[in-house]
Amino acid sequence: MTQAQTWSQRFEKALHPAIATFNASIGFDIELIEYDLTGSVAHAKMLVKTGIISPEEGEALVNGLETIREEYRQGQFNPGVDAEDIHFAVERRLTEIAGDVGKKLHTGRSRNDQVGTDTRLYLKDQIQQIRTQILEFQGVLLDLATNHVHTLIPGYTHLQRAQPLSLAHHLLAYVEMAHRDWERLGEVYQRVNTSPLGCGALAGTTFPIDRHYSAELLGFDRVYANSLDGVSDRDWAIEFLSASSLILVHLSRLSEEIIFWASQEFGFITLTDSCSTGSSIMPQKKNPDVPELVRGKTGRVFGHLQGLLVLMKGLPLAYNKDLQEDKEALFDAVKTVKGCLEAMTILLSQGMEFRPQRLAEAVAEDFSNATDVADYLATKGVPFREAYNLVGKVVRTCLESGKLLKDLTLDEWKSLHPEFDVDIYDAIAPLQVVAARNSYGGTGFEQVKSALQNARDRWEAAQS
């Protein structure tokens, strides 16, 4: 037999134990207990303000709820294995503490608007924490970029060396992605910050409640204008999962690059012992577990987004039990995003070191300065397309003779086109190749310094 639930008087027989277990959410929605208590305190105060319960009853309810909060924080709150959900567990314990007045707490409220309120309060809190983590991650990237303005790194397209870059420019690309993530979560927060409390099961209530007052107590900016929408809306959860997915897209892309950079084939970075592991059979190995796990965990959050979209697409108004499935997706996504941000921040600040000499060698041993040869001829009046075609022949000639562009003699250059002169060597030197790209947003050192300062100013403003 299972203990009677708040709704069980309608039924003649007890719920089958296996179905009770299947139906229960207490195993995961206990995550919401602090928010459930906060929402209930606000609801109790609203009931007093509107005269629905007496001040003495309201005081008893609030004191009882705060007692439960303290019990939970001290590890003394036991919801019981038979509790269907956290709402029932709290109400049962409240009635034990406050007596029959505890049964008045649910006046003018349904579990439908209650759980919607709890989950939004939870997510508001988590969004703020994640945004703080994003700023910490950005700060580490900015510090790295500051130290590597004049460090060169090969730039790639199609994973083929394309043009050399300032390493700071490369890192600042991720700063920009992180800033969009920070902004995007702020926009999601605005949608989450709407109170459904008082919407009831779906149609509102006959009690003279004050929804705006309870919303104000809970820090919501507004209330839902339609009770059906208030209890059935999960757009905000989908938006959060979408924003979380994009955060992890960016972390996963960086992780992929770090994995490449740490390989012997690239050798651009060295992994420190604090953020890498070894092999159980191959003693020479130092494995990039952190970026590999971030890359793998990204798929979890993608799955939660897809799962909630599929869950919602066929639901009629208003509340359906299917919506219970949104909690675990949200909880796991929050923990995954926070864990990945923390791990990547530690990895960038303590777990890897760039190898400037190896990076310089990589930039010097390829044809990533070929575009600059074409640009050189274009500045001499040669049409760019003609210059482009000529440089293709130059590269082919170098490949056939086993040379790099810098190895060609001036006579060889002139034999290819009379406009070539001794200044070609300066034009194709890696530092000059990078420095010359001073268009707005480019990798030129002056542009990078300016972009770095702008990004840091923006970062500092975001923390105020």
UniProtKB/Swiss-Prot annotation:
InterPro entries: Arg_succ_lyase_C, Argininosuccinate_lyase, Fumarase/histidase_N, Fumarate_lyase_CS, Fumarate_lyase_fam, Fumarate_lyase_N, L-Aspartase-like. PROSITE patterns: FUMARATE_LYASES. It comes from Arthrospira platensis (strain NIES-39 / UTEX 3086 / IAM M-135) (Spirulina platensis). The keyword Chaperone does not apply. It catalyses: 2-(N(omega)-L-arginino)succinate = fumarate + L-arginine. SUPFAM superfamilies: L-aspartase-like (SSF48557). GO terms for biological process: arginine biosynthetic process via ornithine; L-arginine biosynthetic process. Belongs to the lyase 1 family. Argininosuccinate lyase subfamily. Strongly inhibited by L-arginine. Inhibitory effects are lowered at pH 7.0 compared to those at pH 8.0. At 37 degrees Celsius and pH 7.5, activity decreases to 73% and 31% in the presence of 1 mM and 10 mM arginine, respectively. Activity also decreases to 84%, 93%, 82% and 85% in the presence of 10 mM sodium citrate, citrulline, asparatate and glutamate, respectively. Activity decreases to 96% in presence of 1 mM L-lysine. This is Argininosuccinate lyase. Pathway: Amino-acid biosynthesis; L-arginine biosynthesis; L-arginine from L-ornithine and carbamoyl phosphate: step 3/3. Keywords: Amino-acid biosynthesis, Arginine biosynthesis, Cytoplasm, Lyase. Catalyzes the last step of arginine biosynthesis, the conversion of argininosuccinate into L-arginine and fumarate. Optimum temperature is 42 degrees Celsius. Shows more than 40% enzymatic activity in terms of relative activity at 20-50 degrees Celsius. Inactive above 55 degrees Celsius. It is found in: Cytoplasm. One of its GO terms (molecular function) is argininosuccinate lyase activity. Optimum pH is 8.0. Shows more than 40% enzymatic activity in terms of relative activity at pH 7.0-9.5. GO terms for cellular component: cytosol. Its EC number is 4.3.2.1.
